[in-house]
Amino acid sequence: MKKLLLSIAFLLPAMGMMAQTQVKTAEGILEGKDLSGITVFKGIPFAAPPVGNLRWKAPQPAQKWQGVREAKEFGPNPMQEPIFGDMNFGTKANSEDCLYLNIWTPAKTMKEHLPVLIYFNGGGLMAGSGSEPRYAGDAMARKGIISITANYREGIFGFFAHPQLSKETSYKGSGNYGFMDQVAAIQWVKDNIEAFGGDPNRITIVGESAGSMSVSALMASPLCQGLFAQAMGSSGSVMGFKKIATQKEAEEKGVQLAQKIAEKMGKETGKKVKKNIGMKNLDELRALPAEELMKLAGVRAVPVYNIDGYFMKEQPVDVFAKGEQTKVPLLIGGNNQEMTPWAVLMGKQPT
C-alpha cells in the first residue's frame, strides 16, 4: 500500500504538467492533440461557413456544437489556384467553407496568461493557408508564446465588390470580406484565448507579404480598435505607390468581372447572354459551385480591396497621417533585394 501511495505521489506532479487537451470555448468543447508537451488545436471554426447566401457577406458568428468536437486536423484551405510553386499545405482540401484557425499552446492551465501571436499568410490575397507547414506554431509555442494561424477568404471569394452587393449592406459598400474574416478571427481569439492559457490583452498580429498588407489594413480599420496590442509586418503594406480603389472603382471592376463570367458561361452553355447581366442580378453567381466560379473568374479575379465605408473608411495613409490608426507598437521589415527579380524582369516570366 505504501508503495502504491508513493507511486501516486510521484505521478501527481507529472500529471499536473501534462498538456491540457480539452478546452471549453464559447461555442463548445474542443479536444486537441498533445505534441510533446504542447497542445495543438486545429480546424477551429471562428465564423459560420461563408457559403450559399453568405457568399460575399461579412463573416457571421460560428455555430455552437454539442459534446466534444475533435480539433486534430486542419480545416480546408481557402479556394485558390496553385499559382505559387513554394506553397505546401497541411491538408489537400480547398473549400469555400474555410474559416478555421489553428492554435499551438504550451499552457498547462488557463491561468498562465501567455502572450499570443496571430499569423496571417501571404499569397497575394489569392492563395495561401494557415495549414502551410512553414507557419506551424510549435517552435514559437516551445518558447512560451501561444501561436495561431487563421484562414481568410481569398481571390474572388474575399475581394469582390459589386453594386448589387453594396445594396445588401447597411453601409452601402461591398468587398473586403477577406479582411473582415481576419477581424473575426482576432475577435474570436480575444474572446476565447484565456481558455487556452493566453492573455487577451497581449495579442500580436503578424503577417508576411499579403499577410503584412493585411496587418497595415487592420491597423487602419476602425473595426480593430482595442483588438490587439502589437503588430508586425514583413514585405508588404496597403500604403504603396498607388491609392486604394474607391468603392465606385471596385464596383466597376466587379461588374466587368461578372460580365466576363457570364459571357464564359454563355459560351459553355450555348445561351445568349444579356449585355448588362453583370449589373443586374447576382443570384446565378451565388448559385455557382465554388470550383466553377473560380474557374470562370480566372486570372481576372485579382483582388481589389477598396474604401468600402465600413472596414476601410478612408485611405490608410491618411488614417496614419492623422494618427487615427490602432495605436500599438509596430515592427516592420523586408528582405534584402526581395524586389530585384521583378525589377530586372519587368514582369516577364524567367526562362
Residue ranges of each PLM-predicted region?
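Bacterial Sec-dependent N-terminal signal peptides
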Residues: 1-21
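Non-catalytic accessory segments of hydrolases
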Residues: 20-176, 200
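Alpha/beta-hydrolase active-site loop
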Residues: 98, 171-194, 249-257
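Surface-exposed acidic, glycine-flexible loop patches that form ligand/cofactor-binding
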Residues: 105-113, 191-199, 222-225, 319-325
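Active-site loop->helix "elbow" adjoining a glycine-rich segment at hydrolase catalytic centers
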Residues: 122, 177-181, 209-212
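Substrate-access "cap/lid" subdomains that shape
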Residues: 191, 217, 225, 239-351
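Primarily recognizes the serine-hydrolase "nucleophile elbow" in alpha/beta-hydrolase
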Residues: 201-245
